[in-house]
Amino acid sequence: TGAAVLPLGVPAAPVLPAPLELSRALRPLQRYRPVSAPLRRVLDETATAERSARAGGVIMPVFRGVRRGDAVVQCVMDASSSMLVWDRMFEELQQIFAQLGAFRDVQMRYLHPGPDGGCTVSRSPDPAAAPLHSADRLSDPTGRRVTVVVSDCAGPLWRSGHAHRLLHQLARLAPVAVLQPLPQRMWNRTRLPVTLGSLTRGEGPAGATLLKVTGDA
């Protein structure tokens, strides 16, 4: 008689190399705060009472700005056919951002070419499985959305230049990063070649959007 076979579930190896190191590298994002102006102003009753008392009973109203909540991170995966093999990496990235605790919310979106060839987004890697919306939905004038685009930078949106224009549009409002899954030796063969350098944060409250790149000699 043959021996009984007992199936065992073995966790798959992570796709992202050194996830703990990646988490540590992302910790500075915990200090990110949107630089937008307050959306509205309300009366600060406590400060008004204290100021009025110091003024001898003359009412001296004090107002304070009310801002939106903490920043969110939106992870946007290029859904071109060459990116299908990186689906699990995208899921792992979501877990890392959720565990980081730096953002109020972690939003996952997929980038597709629209009927006119431009950028559209949806909640599914299959363009037919969920409604397609204009990529303008990724923009937030309050600056509270940090964007991470996951792409090999070789699909149709990169060949047409639409992806580059989307990055430029988003980077005017808040930090944007591209996570390139291909080996570094292949980066300059893509539609988004790189220049090595040092990234420095700008000074003051708007520093997160005033990044300076100094090229390596």
Region roles according to the model:
Residues 71, 80-109, 116:
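…and closely analogous acidic/polar surface helices at protein-protein or active-site interfaces
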Residues 53, 77-81, 112:
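Short, flexible loop/turn elements at secondary-structure junctions
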Residues 80-84, 115-116, 152-159, 183-186:
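Short acidic, S/G/P-rich loop/turn micro-motifs used as interaction or catalytic elements
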Residues 143, 157-217:
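Von Willebrand factor type A / integrin I
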Residues 9, 39-43, 58-62, 110, ...:
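Extended, composition-driven regions rather than compact fold-specific motifs
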Residues 29, 33, 52-53, 93-101, ...:
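Hydrophobic, Leu/Ile/Phe/Ala-enriched alpha-helical segments that form helix-helix packing faces
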Residues 73-75, 106, 144-151, 173-180:
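Hydrophobic beta-strand segments of well-ordered beta-sheets in folded domains
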Residues 1-73, 207-215:
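Acidic/polar low-complexity segments with low predicted structural confidence
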